[in-house]
Amino acid sequence: MTRVKICGLMDEYELECALKAGADALGFVVEIERSRHRLSLDEARNLIGMVPPFTTSVAVVEPAGVDDAVRLADYLQSDALQIHGDLSPEEIEEIKRRVPQRIIVAVPPGSDRAVEVSRIADAVLVDTPVSGGLGGSGRTHDWSVTARMRSTLHAPLILAGGLRPENVMDAINVVKPYAVDVSSGVETNGRKDPVKAEEFVRRVRSCQ
């Protein structure tokens, strides 16, 4: 079964929207300045604390280094840490050794470091590159490239980038990911839309 993560949740209303839609995981963007979904540490920690049992809370972070990642993990207390940026495999391995959270590492399609990172991380998230990093563009990428990546990885692949109810079934059929990750694709006027969120999850489930 393909899992669903709804990311970029900003407040309790959006959290409830994602839960009612049936998302398996909820994502919170923490202190990433380029993201319009960014939360402060305290805002993120408060929302993470509201995530019920059997739903995975994911803190999306861009740490400056190992110590910064550990600081964020310790404070936020999420179930998983989604790491963006250019940390080396050695740094990711050190983070994994020092924190209890599952580690998801974000990479662009066709990344040279994806295979090495996948030997360490609990999952690899493939997202569309944007100026200054990954994610938040609302744009898809070449799914055939990501499908080829999947067969080389040693960890589950999470597909992100421009997904929405209208294209998620095609994306799953091409890539066959462990999970899909959506944010702006289930929004209307910059806010999570319960109808779109429910339709997105319904279409993912129909692929099973």
From Swiss-Prot:
It comes from the Archaea. Pathway: Amino-acid biosynthesis; L-tryptophan biosynthesis; L-tryptophan from chorismate: step 3/5. One of its GO terms (biological process) is L-tryptophan biosynthetic process. InterPro entries: Aldolase_TIM (IPR013785), PRAI_dom (IPR001240), RibuloseP-bd_barrel (IPR011060), TrpF_fam (IPR044643). It is an enzyme of class 5 (isomerase). Pfam families: PRAI. It catalyses: N-(5-phospho-beta-D-ribosyl)anthranilate = 1-(2-carboxyphenylamino)-1-deoxy-D-ribulose 5-phosphate. Its EC number is 5.3.1.24. One of its GO terms (molecular function) is phosphoribosylanthranilate isomerase activity. Keywords: Amino-acid biosynthesis, Aromatic amino acid biosynthesis, Isomerase, Tryptophan biosynthesis. Belongs to the TrpF family. HAMAP family: PRAI (MF_00135). This is N-(5'-phosphoribosyl)anthranilate isomerase. The lineage of its organism: Archaea, Methanobacteriati, Methanobacteriota, Stenosarchaea group, Methanomicrobia.
